[in-house]
């Protein structure tokens, strides 16, 4: 079985949610125009927020997988093209809303989040704003286990 994967090399701007989201949307649309048989697009760590920031900046940028605007916007493109999308984002815990994670979400072909990986070994600067995850989740898809 052959799987067509596109890996996005983008440089997000710290704190500029709209710019970062537009860059991601443009990349998805361009990829699907040029390579319509793409099945999975993978974006980098913290693609929606930018990387080096303060606790306050990440608190303002964080979202949950249930109600995040970026989840919905990227999910709508996953559903439109029938593809899987992975991207990194600062995740807010749904129960303990002051707890943040450096996470990656897998969006399915219907545009819904399948699950989240929370970075297990954050670097020293990341530890100022995010908590370490403790699992290595695997997700069953029609492409195989991801």
Role assignments for model-derived ranges:
Residues 67-92:
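A short, hydrophobic beta-strand-centered structural micro-motif
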Residues 20, 31-59, 78, 85-86:
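Active-site beta-strand/loop signature of hydrolases that rely on acidic residues for catalysis
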Residues 1-38:
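N-terminal active-site segment of His-dependent metallophosphoesterases
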Residues 2-16, 42, 103, 116-118, ...:
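Active-site-proximal beta-strand elements of phosphoester/diester hydrolases
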Residues 66, 76, 93-146:
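Active-site catalytic loop in hydrolytic enzyme cores
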Residues 11, 47, 90-91:
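Catalytic metal-binding/acid-base residues of hydrolase active sites
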Residues 1, 79-86, 98-100, 132:
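Short, basic and Ser/Thr-rich N-terminal targeting/leader segments
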């Amino acid at each position: 079985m052959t799987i067509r994967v596109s890996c996005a090399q983008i440089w997000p701007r710290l704190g500029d949610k709209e710019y970062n989201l537009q860059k991601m949307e443009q990349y998805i649309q361009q990829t699907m125009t040029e390579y319509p048989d793409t099945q999975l697009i993978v974006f980098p760590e913290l693609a929606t927020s930018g990387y080096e920031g303060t606790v306050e900046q990440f608190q303002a940028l964080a979202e949950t997988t249930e109600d995040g605007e970026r989840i919905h916007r990227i999910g709508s493109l996953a559903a439109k093209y029938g593809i899987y999308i992975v991207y990194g984002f600062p995740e807010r815990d749904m129960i303990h809303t002051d707890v943040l994670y450096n996470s990656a979400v897998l969006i399915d072909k219907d545009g819904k989040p399948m699950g989240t990986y929370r970075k297990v070994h954050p670097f020293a600067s990341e530890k100022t704003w995010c908590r370490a995850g403790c699992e290595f989740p695997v997700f069953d898809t029609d492409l195989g286990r991801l």
